[in-house]
Amino acid sequence: MNGEEQYYAATQLYKDSCAFQRGPAPEFSAGPPACLYMGRQPPPPPPHPFPGALGALEQGSPPDISPYEVPPLADDPAVAHLHHHLPAQLALPHPPAGPFPEGAEPGVLEEPNRVQLPFPWMKSTKAHAWKGQWAGGAYAAEPEENKRTRTAYTRAQLLELEKEFLFNKYISRPRRVELAVMLNLTERHIKIWFQNRRMKWKKEEDKKRGGGTAVGGGGVAEPEQDCAVTSGEELLALPPPPPPGGAVPPAAPVAAREGRLPPGLSASPQPSSVAPRRPQEPR
C-alpha cells in the first residue's frame, strides 16, 4: 500500500505543481515564483485528505478492490519537505513596484488592446469630434498625420481683418503682430488669410475687367433707326447732299418724290449744267 500512497501523493503534487515551482538559480529566490506572479491567483490551501475524491474512487473501483483510507499526506517525508518550504514562499513580500518586473521586457506586459490616441490638441478640434462616436475608432492603427485642420474665424475676427484689408492689401510685420495679439491669432494665420484674400480680390478684379473688355470690343451699339426712315419713299424724298462747289441742285420732281418714275429714268439728281427732262404726261 505504500506504493499506492506515493502514487496519489505524486498525482496531487502534479496538479498543484505551479504553486510549488521554484527558480533554478538561487538569486531568484527573493521573489515569488513566476507562475504565481503572472497568474495572479491566490495560493491553494495546503493539501489535506480528499474524502470526495476517495468516494469517487470507491464508486468506480472494481468489486475485488476493498476500500481503504489514505493517511494524511503530511506523514510522507517528501510531502513534509514541501510543506516546510511552502509557508516561506507564501510569506515572501511582493515584488517592488516598478515600471517592469525583473527580467521582463517593456513590450511583454503592454496591454494588447491598447490604442494609440491622437494628441491632446487634436482632440479639441471639430475635425476629430466624430472619432469619439465612431465604433471603429478603437481599431485604428495610428492617428492621421500630415493633416492640418481648417481655422474657423469668428465674425469679430473677420470684421477686423476685412477692415485692415480695405486699407492695406499687403500687411507689414509689425501690424501683423499687433493684429495677432488683438485677435488672439497667430501671425501665420493672419499671413495666410491675407494671401487668400488677395487672390480672391485679384479674381474679382479680373472678372470685372473681362466684362468691360467684352462690351468695348464689340463696339458701342448704334441707336435703332425708325422704320419710316428705312422706307423707300422717305429715302427718295430726302434732298441730296450739296456738291462741293456750293451750288444748290434743283429740287427733285414730284413724280420722283412720289415714286412714279418711268422705267428708263432714275431718281438720281442730274448735274447742274444739264436741264432735267420732264416726263410726258399720259393722254
From Swiss-Prot:
Question: Annotated region Disordered: where?
Answer: 34-72, 201-283
- Biased-composition ranges, Gly residues, are 211-220
Name the major location.
nucleus
Q: Where is this motif: Nuclear localization signal?
A: 197-203
* One Gene Ontology cellular component: nuclear speck
- Print the keywords alphabetically: Activator, Cytoplasm, DNA-binding, Homeobox, Nucleus, Phosphoprotein, Transcription, Transcription regulation
Pfam families the record matches: Homeodomain (PF00046)
Presence of keyword Phosphoprotein:
yes
Q: Where is this region: Transactivation domain?
A: 13-73
Renumbered ranges of motif Antp-type hexapeptide: 118-123
As for PTM, the annotation reads: Phosphorylated by the SAPK2 pathway at high intracellular glucose concentration. Phosphorylated by HIPK2 on Ser-268 upon glucose accumulation. This phosphorylation mediates subnuclear localization shifting. Phosphorylation by PASK may lead to translocation into the cytosol.
Which positions bear Phosphoserine? 268
Positions with biased composition (Pro residues): 41-50, 238-252
**Localization per record:** Nucleus; Cytoplasm, Cytosol
Q: Which residues carry this modification: Phosphothreonine?
A: 151
**Protein family (similarity comment):** Belongs to the Antp homeobox family. IPF1/XlHbox-8 subfamily.
Oligomer status and interactors: Interacts with the basic helix-loop-helix domains of TCF3(E47) and NEUROD1 and with HMG-I(Y). Interacts with SPOP. Part of a PDX1:PBX1b:MEIS2b complex.
What is stated about domains?
Answer: The Antp-type hexapeptide mediates heterodimerization with PBX on a regulatory element of the somatostatin promoter.
Q: What is this protein called?
A: Pancreas/duodenum homeobox protein 1
